[in-house]
Amino acid sequence: GEEKMQKKTDRRVRKTKSQLKTGLAQLMREKSIREITVKELVDAVDINRSTFYLHYSDIPGLLAEIENEMMEEMQRAIREHPIDPGKDTVYYFIQDLFHVLDENRQIASALVGPHGDIGFVHKLEQLLEEKSRESLAALVPEKSGEMKYFYSYCLNGCLGFVKTWLETGENETPEYAAEMAYRMVVSSVTAFYDTKEGREDN
């Protein structure tokens, strides 16, 4: 009986947190996180203020939990796909990343949007940068002075891709998006090295 009650409570807590997350994502489309009040959020999702305070001390606390959970899922994707040159681990990592974003599409879209959290965007950048440095080094063993520019190009391209997909790509599956992003990165790598070597021959 006690275990059953616990499961029921857990389910209710999950439902409440999910409603708050959705409500926050919707409000963040209109205004910055600093302007959103607890009253506004609980009214939007039809939950008591006391229920909100049972789980969070304030709006930034709620946002921090949401961001941390997403980051943990992305970190897990990184751990599960260590770089293995010659294998498609990079592709599977990208696919997992898109799955995490897809499962959190509303809030992820709000976070990278105009009223989003620049701190979250930076964390996402760091995560992608670590992985892209690792994967590019695996794809292209020699280090050159141009690599930092190439990292920057790939990183910003990936971030732009993610933003566009979150905002407009509801009908495109994470697999489809991952395939497309992967093709773009690989073709950039290939083109970068082909033209570089081509020029040196002339």
Model-predicted segments: where are they?
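Hydrophobic alpha-helical connector segments
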Residues: R79-I107
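Short, basic, alpha-helical segments at the C-terminal edge of helix-turn-helix-like DNA-binding modules
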Residues: T37-V38, I66-Q75
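Basic, helix-initiating cap at the start of DNA-binding domains
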Residues: E2-K31
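Terminal, non-globular segments
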Residues: M74, I78, L128, S132-S135, ...
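Amphipathic alpha-helical packing segments from all-alpha helical-bundle domains
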Residues: H115-V140, G145-G160, V186, T190
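C-terminal peripheral helix-coil segments that are non-catalytic and often amphipathic
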Residues: N156, T164-N202
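Helix-turn-helix
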Residues: L27-G61
